[in-house]
Amino acid sequence: EVECLPGPTAFVPALVSSGLPSDRFSFEGFLPVKKGRTKRLKELSTETKTMVFYESPHRILKTLNDLSNYFEVESQISVSRELTKLYEETFRGTIKESVEHFEKNKTKGEFVIVLSPK
């Protein structure tokens, strides 16, 4: 088990604890909410390196569903919330499993998604 100490950004502990390849990655931040979202997802769908996204609790399920439409559903993903806080939680699995998990488990907090498209 890896424990990463907090720093100034949430994506670094999420990336390290994800267990996904971190030798090459891109930080994508928040995906566009409306305008440009589909275009950005299409652009990212050909990416081969690990990608890191931020997402709000109100859009987490939509974003996971969108990712499942543009990437292989068996792609590995890690979804972390409330990093370094009392209710810290990380889900690891496939995109498909993450959609199923978050359909059943409504959670609060800000999320960091780490996606390995390979």
Language-model segments: which ranges?
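A contiguous loop/helix-start segment that scaffolds small-molecule binding in enzyme catalytic cores
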Residues: 49-50, 54-118
